Swiss-Prot record:
Family membership: Belongs to the glucagon family.
InterPro entries hit by this protein: Glucagon_GIP_secretin_VIP, Prosecretin
PANTHER family registered for this protein in UniProt: SECRETIN
GO molecular function: digestive hormone activity; hormone activity
Cellular compartment(s): Secreted
Official protein name in the record: Secretin
Biological function: Hormone involved in different processes, such as regulation of the pH of the duodenal content, food intake and water homeostasis. Exerts its biological effects by binding to secretin receptor (SCTR), a G-protein coupled receptor expressed in the basolateral domain of several cells. Acts as a key gastrointestinal hormone by regulating the pH of the duodenal content.
Primary gene name: SCT
Keywords per UniProt: Amidation, Hormone, Secreted
Species the sequence originates in: Ovis aries (Sheep)
Valine amide: modified positions: V27
Length: 27
């Protein structure tokens, strides 16, 4: 089953959200 792909997607989303938050903090 696709548990691994799901967790990788979750981690990617979390990383992108963190990046967006960092960028907003810079602005």
């Amino acid at each position: 089953h696709s548990d691994g792909t799901f967790t990788s997607e979750l981690s990617r989303l979390r990383d992108s959200a963190r990046l967006q938050r960092l960028l907003q903090g810079l602005v």
